[in-house]
Regions:
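Alpha/beta enzyme core
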Residues: 1-102, 106-129, 142-143, 147
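Conserved alpha/beta catalytic core and glycan-binding cleft of carbohydrate-active enzymes
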Residues: 110-179
Length: 179
């Protein structure tokens, strides 16, 4: 850009699960229109991996990497998307949301969970992330602290503080919240 700031363009598609779009002007969307409209005027579409692939292919020339949002951690679906994109755009970088919305244990066993990221990396998903990881981690931590604090008082908090002190040697800096 004009300020010489590095920029990465990430194109995201939710077409795998989205059932509505705002208009019918894009030729890319036309094969997926159902012909029906919602009471609010939106257009119903056939959601699924094929529409997500279609969107990904449309985005590929204009983006640095492509993110296909998924409903479950599904290696077959991830491979189908990656293969379709790479067939026309070899080496195109892909992004994968290792989503906190997934019930990982419901869909994968422990070994599959442990190898999931390595497997999708082989497919070209080089940017892997967990949206809202901090939100979920923070909330369960404070919930557990509240339970323990109710039963044990300051002893519960003191144990957390000791963990913080012990982690300073590793680079943890939040012991001092006032600097």
């Amino acid at each position: 850009d004009i300020a010489d700031v590095p920029l990465i363009i990430l194109a995201r598609t939710d077409a795998n699960a989205a059932k509505l779009i705002t208009n019918d002007h894009d030729d890319n969307d036309k094969p997926f229109l159902t012909g029906e409209r919602s009471p609010e005027g939106f257009y119903y579409v056939k959601a699924g991996i094929d529409q997500a692939i279609s969107r990904g292919l449309a985005y590929a020339p204009y983006s640095d990497l492509i993110w296909c949002e998924t409903a479950t951690p599904n290696l077959e679906e991830a491979k189908k998307f990656a293969d379709a994109i790479h067939k026309k755009f070899p080496g195109k970088l892909l992004a994968y949301n290792c989503s906190p919305s997934f019930n990982w244990k419901k869909h994968l066993n422990d070994d599959e969970i442990a190898s999931f990221q390595q497997e999708i990396s082989k497919m070209g998903y080089k940017f892997q992330f967990i949206t809202l990881a901090g939100f979920h981690t923070q909330n369960i931590a404070i919930f557990e602290l509240a339970e323990k604090y109710k039963k044990e008082g300051m002893a519960a908090y003191s144990r957390i503080q000791e963990q913080e002190f012990a982690r300073e040697k590793d680079g943890y800096t939040s012991v001092k919240h006032q600097r």
